[in-house]
Design a protein with these regions (language model features):
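Short, small-residue-biased leader/transition segments that mark boundaries at the very start
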Residues: 1-5
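Short beta-strand/loop segments at the ligand-binding rim of alpha/beta enzyme cores
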Residues: 6-9, 69
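Distinct, well-ordered alpha-helical segments
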Residues: 17-26, 84-85
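Short, electropositive alpha-helical surface patch
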Residues: 81-105, 123-137
Length: 148
């Protein structure tokens, strides 16, 4: 079946610092790792990582160990959750995220927005046009980018 179907794994990337996890992910055809912001505070609002030691820098350093053999996936959204504003589409957010993309050098980037209801009904989907503008900036780095 491996000759006919590609094996894909989507991971929140919180365990990729572990050698056993990294080795396993390198064995699949499409190793898709999530990173939704360049800022710890935004990631905490969006994803609520359970590890107190989670840092974007730690995830980025672990992603770099894949030497480009990964696909980076990022969800863009805006709104409010738990009384806190969240928006990873601002120029500050996108520019900082693009610097990390350039540092990680994944084989591909996938950008998308909300596609179903969330626990926070005040979160808003980002338009396809906004996602395409972000994708164009990724492609300007020489990295293919798809919009979903």
């Amino acid at each position: 079946l491996g000759d006919v179907y590609k094996r894909q794994v989507l991971s929140n990337a919180t365990q990729i610092h572990r050698d056993s996890v990294r080795r396993a992910l390198l064995r699949v055809d499409n190793n898709i790792l999530k990173l939704d912001s360049a800022f710890d505070a935004t990631v905490r609002r969006m994803n609520n990582p359970q590890s107190a030691s989670y840092t974007v820098r730690g995830i980025v350093e672990a992603m770099k160990r894949f030497d480009g053999r990964m696909i980076l996936q990022t969800m863009f959204l805006r709104g409010e959750c738990g009384g806190q504003p969240v928006d990873n589409t601002t120029e500050e957010e996108v520019s900082a995220w693009l610097r990390l993309v350039a540092e990680i050098r994944p084989q591909q980037v996938m950008v998308y927005s909300l596609d179903r209801d969330t626990p926070c009904p005040t979160l808003e989907k980002v338009t396809k046009e906004e996602l395409q503008a972000i994708a164009a900036r990724v492609e300007a780095l020489g990295i293919p980018c798809s919009v979903a």
